Amino acid sequence: MIKAGSAIGGKGMQPKAVGSGLRALLVLTALAIGLLTAWGALVRTTGSGLGCPDWPLCHGRIFPPLSDLAAWLEWIHRLLAASVTPLLALSGLIAWRRERRPDLYRPLAWALGLLFGQALLGGVTVILELPPTIVAIHLAMAMIILALVLVAAVRAHAPWASRPPPTDLEAVRPAAAAVRGIGMVGLALFALALVGASVTGSGASWACSDWPLCTGGVLWPGDLLGRVHMFHRVLALGVGIALGGLALALSGRREMPRGVFYWILAAFALYIVQIGLGAINLRMGFPAALNALHLGLAAAIWAAVVVAWAWALGEAQWAEGVPAESLRLRNLWEPYVTLTKPGIVALLLVTTAGAMFIAQRGLPPILTFVYTLLGGLLVSGGANAMNNVWDAELDRRMHRTARRPIPAGRLGRWEAAVVAALFSVAGLLILWTFVNPTAAALALAGWVWYVGIYTMVLKRWTPQNIVIGGAAGGFAPVVGWAAVTGRVDPMAFFLFALIFLWTPPHTWAFAILTERDYREAGVPMLPVVTGPRAAAFQVLFYTVLLALWSLVPVAIRALGFLYLVGAGLLNAWLLILALRLWQDPSRAPARRLYHASNAYLFFFFVLMVADRLLAG
């Protein structure tokens, strides 16, 4: 047992405040970076980013022409960037050599490295004439640099050190929950800023001339630029609601310092002003001054949320007599990750990505590929999280699931439900906006099937729950297919049915392995109702059906010889394991079949992709 705390995931955080000189220097550095970010917004909105067409000089000179305003705006931006460098370097050097504080010099070192990277990226931006993607990355780096310096500044002040540290884990749980809540809002703000930069860079600012709806009172326009514009507004609305809800929740938390609440309240107040400014900006035709103010306010809101998050993190890690490992940042976030069942999500994304490659007969358009996987990750993660919320009482009665975040008390049920809903809605919006409505509708159907039909009804009702409910997993490859083609073809139905037939052998093998858990919890899984031997026969039966169905693409000449040979080997492997399980329906054969079925599905999709690519 040691005094807890760490740098952002590192070791050796000292919770006491540092000298006033370093504190003042860090505040000055943060203000300089904030000014740099705001000036960058002015440069971007006035179109002055190419005011100096070369780099690092300006028109081949150290000083730009006196009569060229755009050149001076860009030159001052570069000068501010150059002035931030020594401030950052000096702060890091003092934190390292004099204070010997890893929790301070590590984020400052990262910030300095990112600053050099941002300077190089700025040169690329000029040379490539401001491509929107590079501009968005440049903004993202600026926001991360500001956040790292603010985290160091808050740690240097250490407001939590004014009171004795708590001595048990329960006492820091409210602060840990605040870290997660503020962090989620911060990530949403980060995404909102990047989407806003994409709206400006892509020309989508003018796609909707009305407010709050799009042109002509349309809620969701059909064209891509209109959808991107409205996605930004919907995301802004969601972030505003989340920020307001967070302020309301923190206002009633007496165990949390009021300073954390006041920073979030300030962010929410600025956000209300920001929304009004956005509407005025649209009505006035996006004048440069208002645009710059809009982006400057965004930086101020981001800074306020980061300060609140860093303060809450310090509170969560200010403990004595608690294992330090349990208070590391990654462990404070762990409940959210575990809630989404990342192993299941990863396998679903393999089938989605595989279907996209098969449909495209090669690499899909890169942005479509990224947005489909991102949307799929959020929707499937949200569905799994909602499954955890609904099954929380059931999970408490099962040894295998009792350590999940909700039954173990690491996460409240309402907090988990909010996270599940946010992930799901965000994923569906991404698919609808950046991919196509068909993919979004199919993802929604899969979500409803898994949460509404399987989790809420079938799981507790019938031993055939997994046969019917297993169709939910079949939607993942169909979403991938529709993302590329915009429709559902016969091959997509084949992939759906493949997952449908694969699910019973996979799940019942696991149910045989964990039969005692299901029996004690009262879940009517097939091995509980019929016994392991009868369930093992059903595993063999569905494995035979799966093997036969896998040959359909060869029969219709959709896939070729490579697939035929590979499918034969994979099916023989799984059939042998299923036969052995039927002969000996015990834990060891069930475990082998369960793990093999995961590998089977992965290699099956790799095989189909390889066959399509070779066939051209």
Please report, for each region that a protein language model flagged, where it lies by residue.
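Polytopic transmembrane helical bundles with strong interfacial aromatic enrichment
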Residues: 2-3, 8-336, 345, 361, ...
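Multi-pass membrane catalytic core of lipid/isoprenoid biosynthesis enzymes
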Residues: 400-441, 531-554
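Transmembrane alpha-helical segments that form the membrane-embedded catalytic/substrate-channel core
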Residues: 39, 190-198, 378-386, 449-455, ...
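Intramembrane alpha-helical segments
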Residues: 120, 134, 413, 417-484
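Core segments of transmembrane alpha-helices
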Residues: 81-88, 235-244, 345-349, 420-426, ...
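Helix-coil boundary and interhelical linker segments in multi-pass alpha-helical membrane proteins
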Residues: 357-374, 426-441, 477-499, 551-563, ...
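Interfacial loop-to-transmembrane junctions
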Residues: 290-293, 575-603
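Small-residue-rich segments of transmembrane alpha-helices in multi-pass membrane proteins
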Residues: 143-148, 351-353, 405, 468-484, ...
